[in-house]
Amino acid sequence: MSSDLLCGSHAAPVVTQLRRHAPLVHCITNDVVQNFTANVLLALGASPAMVVDTDEAAQFAAIADALLINLGTLTRPQQQAMRAAIDSACAAGKPWTLDPVAVGALTLRTEFAQEILARRPAAIRANASEIRALTGESGGGRGVDATESAHQAREAARLLARRTGAVVAVTGEVDYITDGERTVAVEGGTAMLTRVVGTGCALSAVVAACCALPGDRLENVATACWLMKRAGEEALTVSRGPGSFASALLDNLHAQAFGGAYETH
């Protein structure tokens, strides 16, 4: 399966739309990453909100421009709020994104992820092991970490996209984004992104924000991946370790959104 390579010149129009529309993203995400996720969205010009009560989640999902469902610290009571929010978003015509953290490794979240896939997410952002688990392959990573490369899960991602109608982003050293017919690759980034808690979960929130934008959803989701990788590369050049890298990542995401300079490679 061949993949087209996304470069900065293709990402630039999507970044402009992100800044212009400033989508309101309803994040039902895990307890570990809420603050960092909110700051990443703000850095890019989007607006985050974390509404978790079941009744309020349903109300707010209809108001927001996009919804993120992240299974990182899933509990049975939280499932009710997630179902209500997804149903409300779907009824209002709002896109929702699934981040199926650690599916395949744990039973509760794996069964719940399979259940809500029937509600047709606009996008799915996951690592290789999670993508393979969603398709019923062996899957099952080491907790939240993948035990396979994104390249190994490209075909599973394509099949999952065809089955669900979602744009599927399988992320790793190289990210692959597919709608089941077309596939885009995003290269770059840095291993330091794996040394800061929440970068993957925050990326899923950016994917959700980009799903609210007009235009080609495949390119929109690929641009979300490009933004995180590019900002990570730039942050690495000015940081001394994970702590300073996290701050520099936010600064460089903001620079990508508001600086207006995009390389063609």
Curated annotation (Swiss-Prot):
Domain of life: Bacteria
Keywords assigned by UniProt, alphabetized: ATP-binding, Kinase, Magnesium, Metal-binding, Nucleotide-binding, Thiamine biosynthesis, Transferase
Top enzyme category: transferase
Pathway membership, UniProt: Cofactor biosynthesis; thiamine diphosphate biosynthesis; 4-methyl-5-(2-phosphoethyl)-thiazole from 5-(2-hydroxyethyl)-4-methylthiazole: step 1/1
Cofactor (UniProt): Mg(2+)
Entry's Gene Ontology BP terms: thiamine biosynthetic process; thiamine diphosphate biosynthetic process
Single Gene Ontology MF annotation: ATP binding
InterPro entries membership: Hyethyz_kinase (IPR000417), Ribokinase-like (IPR029056)
KW Transferase (keyword) present: yes
Binding site for ATP: 125, 171
UniProt-listed Enzyme Commission number(s): 2.7.1.50
Function summary: Catalyzes the phosphorylation of the hydroxyl group of 4-methyl-5-beta-hydroxyethylthiazole (THZ).
Protein family according to the UniProt entry: Belongs to the Thz kinase family.
Name the UniProt record assigns to this protein: Hydroxyethylthiazole kinase
Originating organism: Cronobacter sakazakii (strain ATCC BAA-894)
Gene: thiM
